[in-house]
A protein has these predicted regions:
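Structural cue for short, hydrophobic secondary-structure segments
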Residues: 47-51, 81
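A short beta-strand-turn-helix
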Residues: 25-45, 54
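Loop/turn elements at helix/coil->beta-strand transitions in domains of secreted/extracellular proteins
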Residues: 43-46, 75-78, 134, 142-143
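Thiol-/selenol-based redox modules, centered on thioredoxin-like
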Residues: 124-125, 132-168
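Structural microenvironment flanking redox-active thiols in thiol-disulfide oxidoreductases
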Residues: 55-106
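Hydrophobic alpha-helical targeting segments used for export or membrane insertion
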Residues: 3-14
Length: 168
């Protein structure tokens, strides 16, 4: 019988065996600046959250304490949120982005929130995302190499994995 630990180890090995690169992408942050990703990711390591639904914000927020702790130890760590919507929503982009902007009082968080209005299929395939029902959490280096990738809200085991990926 295969244990949960074995399944987790196999998943980690599969990711390292099929190393992924963050696909070139353009988006605009909630401060109105256009960014080219991964080129404009500013950290030596970047934690990137990809969310597909409004209600997934709670899952993104669940990582907050872990990230606060990591940023105290790693000043070069940057965090980005990428709300990811289909192209058809571009027509109402001002309304969507304006609503998010009003809901985020911190200009630093707004600058790191980059809404994508894209053809989601190729983006998800490039990242190996099979469902929009969970958030994706990635650690991306300055070259766009994905060092770590998992799905869902923070758990103690995922926190330990993230800390190991970043280097305690």
């Amino acid at each position: 019988m295969i244990s949960l630990l074995h399944v987790s180890l196999l998943a980690m090995l599969q990711l390292s065996d099929t190393a992924r690169v963050f696909p070139p992408m353009q988006g605009q942050n909630l401060e109105g600046r256009t960014l080219e990703m991964p080129r404009d990711f500013a950290g030596a390591l970047n934690v990137v959250f990809i969310a597909f639904k409004r209600e997934q914000q709670a899952d993104v927020d669940s990582w907050g304490a872990a990230l606060d702790s990591l940023r105290k130890r790693h000043a070069e760590l940057q965090v980005y949120e990428l709300p990811t919507l289909g192209r058809r929503y571009r027509l109402i982009r001002p309304m969507i982005d304006g609503g998010m902007r009003r809901g985020i009082p911190d200009p630093t968080v707004r600058a790191a929130t980059i809404t994508l209005y894209i053809d989601k299929g190729p983006f998800k395939r490039a990242l190996g995302i099979t469902t929009e029902d969970r958030i994706e959490v990635l650690v991306v280096d300055p070259r766009g190499n994905i060092r770590w990738q998992r799905s869902g809200p923070m758990t103690p085991s995922l926190r330990a994995e993230l800390e190991a990926a970043i280097g305690r």
